[in-house]
């Protein structure tokens, strides 16, 4: 592959072998959709380290694994549960079931004749070596969720794979020289909320519009906005995964972050996309400016949630003396009130959570505080 020089307006030359013969040609555009092979990223040396240090291990087992059978409730108790009525009495195994813990989440998804199970984790909380094989992953699942031991170990394993670190970044997405990256050949954050589909659809929208732009000057003008927008869309996601992944282990903290992230998702991603505004010249200059501020705002909030999570893990301090049994009972049920001046003054303790730095081995120390 010989890429044309930027600004030359020339064509790209390509050559490849197929069926024992060499084929060559010229192209106006080159779009790398090679997935994790990342042909152009490696060729042009565009790779950049991601601050997200997460891994995954996943497998398929034969048959449908029914989570309702992994319970101590009898069939009548299962049938009469109030939440089943709210869900229309649909079998639980028909849904995607997620289980969350400190720095990880685990999925169970029914497929045709088989069940997909997988673990996504912060490397500061789970060691990939502990789940690197199908046997080790099954052992981990049964240890963390013991009722699965009644069924899962007897299932035939059909497929297994894993990634020690799956997040991807690069230095450039699209060029006026008429080449671009899409899909995992470009960037990837984390499977939580499945944002990969959002990045793919957004980047493909920008690349498609660029390909349809015939005038070189107009193309260069668009790319001056498209490139920072593509990076801002990626970087705004990063703090949600790199800073506070351990808050998945607390229902209250996760509920708070979920409401915030759902609001951001629809306001910044969904509504502009479904209204065809991403490539609207009157819209995207202001959109890029707003998006560039979202990343820092999200980072600050994720640090606050992390500090709150660490504070909640502190043991409850009982008063040295209590004037009455009523006040004793009241005090024992309450945690120490957090200072109301600044979030940075919240009491902290060591937590097994990555700070989002380039080193996955870094931990929050007792002296650290949110920024």
Language-model-detected regions and their locations in the chain:
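A broad "ordered helical/assembly scaffold" signature
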Residues: 1, 8-13, 23, 59-62, ...
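Predominantly flavin-linked oxidoreductase catalytic cores and closely associated redox partners
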Residues: 2-147, 204
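Short, surface-exposed, charge-dense and proline/glycine-enriched linear segments
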Residues: 24-26, 30, 36, 81-88, ...
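A residue-identity detector for tryptophan
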Residues: 29, 60, 105-107, 140, ...
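Generic alpha-helix signal with a bias toward terminal, lower-confidence helices
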Residues: 37, 60, 69-73, 118-120, ...
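Generic preference for well-ordered secondary structure
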Residues: 45, 92, 163-166, 188, ...
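FAD/FMN-dependent oxidoreductases across multiple families
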Residues: 96, 102-106, 112, 122-245
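C-terminal helical "tail/cap" subdomain of flavin- and related membrane-associated enzymes
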Residues: 210-371
